[in-house]
Amino acid sequence: MTDQRKGSDAEPTTHFGFKNVPESQKAEKVAEVFHSVAAKYDLMNDLLSGGMHRLWKRFAIELSGVRAGNRVLDIAGGTGDLTKKFSHLVGPTGQVVLADINESMLKVGRDRLLDVGVSGNVEFVQADAEKLPFPDNHFDCVTIAFGLRNVTHKEDALRSMLRVLKPGGRLLVLEFSKPTNALMSKAYDAYSFAFMPLMGKLITNDSESYRYLAESIRMHPNQETLKSMMVDAGFDRVTYHNMTAGIVALHRGIKP
C-alpha cells in the first residue's frame, strides 16, 4: 500500500514489485520496464499465457456492452488488442481512445493498428490513469486490461475513470488476481518466479522486468479488495468473474 512513512517529513513510499520506493519514483521505474518490453510485448504475452490472454480479453469485450456509436476509453491500451476489437464494434459513428502513459507502448500500439488499417475512429493519447485528460461524463465504457496493478494511486485512478464515464457507463478492470485454490497458487508461484524471468531472459534479454511483473501481480489487491475499492470510488453494481481458477479476474462496475 502507499503512504508508508519513516518519519513525519519523509516522502510516502509505495511498492515497486516487492521493493518499497518513493512514490515519485514508481512511475519512472514502471516506465523503464515497459520501454524494455514494448517491442516483444505481444510475443511474450502469447508465450507466457499460452494464448489465454486473448480469451480473457474476449470475455471482457463480451461483458463491455459496447455497440455502434459508443465512445470507449481503453486505458493502458498498450499494443491495441482491445482497441482493435472496440473499433469494429463502435463503427464509423463511434470513437475509441487508446490511452497509455508509456510512450514506447503507445507507439507500438499505434504502428500495429495502422498496419492493419485501424485508424479512422481511433485516437491515441499519452495519459496518466490517475489524471485522465478528458471531460466529465464523456465515455460509454472505460477498460483497463493488465494495467491497474502498475498504477501508484489506484483509488485516484478509479475515481478518475468514474469521472469521465457517462451515467450508466461501464468500467471493466481485467487484471491478474489471486488463485482460488492452494494447489493452483503454489504452481502459479513456481511458474511466475522461475519460468517468467527465464523466458524474459531468453526472449528479451531482460529477466528483471519479468521478475517485476511477477512481483507486481502478487502485490495487487485481491478480488474482494478491488471490488471494495471500486465501490468506495463510487461505482454501483460491482461484480467480478474469476477466470483460469482466479489467476485473472474481470471486475465490472456501473457509474450511477
Swiss-Prot record:
Coiled coil: none
Reaction(s) catalysed (UniProt annotation): a 2-demethylmenaquinol + S-adenosyl-L-methionine = a menaquinol + S-adenosyl-L-homocysteine + H(+); a 2-methoxy-6-(all-trans-polyprenyl)benzene-1,4-diol + S-adenosyl-L-methionine = a 5-methoxy-2-methyl-3-(all-trans-polyprenyl)benzene-1,4-diol + S-adenosyl-L-homocysteine + H(+)
EC nos: 2.1.1.163, 2.1.1.201
Residue positions binding S-adenosyl-L-methionine: T79, D100, D128, A129
Record InterPro entries: SAM-dependent_MTases_sf (IPR029063), UbiE/COQ5_MeTrFase (IPR004033), UbiE/COQ5_MeTrFase_CS (IPR023576)
Family annotation (Pfam families): Ubie_methyltran
GO biological processes: aerobic respiration; menaquinone biosynthetic process; methylation
CDD domains attached to this UniProt entry: AdoMet_MTases
Biological pathway: Quinol/quinone metabolism; menaquinone biosynthesis; menaquinol from 1,4-dihydroxy-2-naphthoate: step 2/2; Cofactor biosynthesis; ubiquinone biosynthesis
Keywords, in A-Z order: Menaquinone biosynthesis, Methyltransferase, S-adenosyl-L-methionine, Transferase, Ubiquinone biosynthesis
Enzyme class: transferase
GO molecular function, one term: demethylmenaquinone methyltransferase activity
HAMAP family: MenG_UbiE_methyltr
Membership in a protein family: Belongs to the class I-like SAM-binding methyltransferase superfamily. MenG/UbiE family.
Function: Methyltransferase required for the conversion of demethylmenaquinol (DMKH2) to menaquinol (MKH2) and the conversion of 2-polyprenyl-6-methoxy-1,4-benzoquinol (DDMQH2) to 2-polyprenyl-3-methyl-6-methoxy-1,4-benzoquinol (DMQH2).
Protein name per UniProt: Ubiquinone/menaquinone biosynthesis C-methyltransferase UbiE
Source organism (scientific name): Pseudomonas fluorescens (strain Pf0-1)
Gene: ubiE
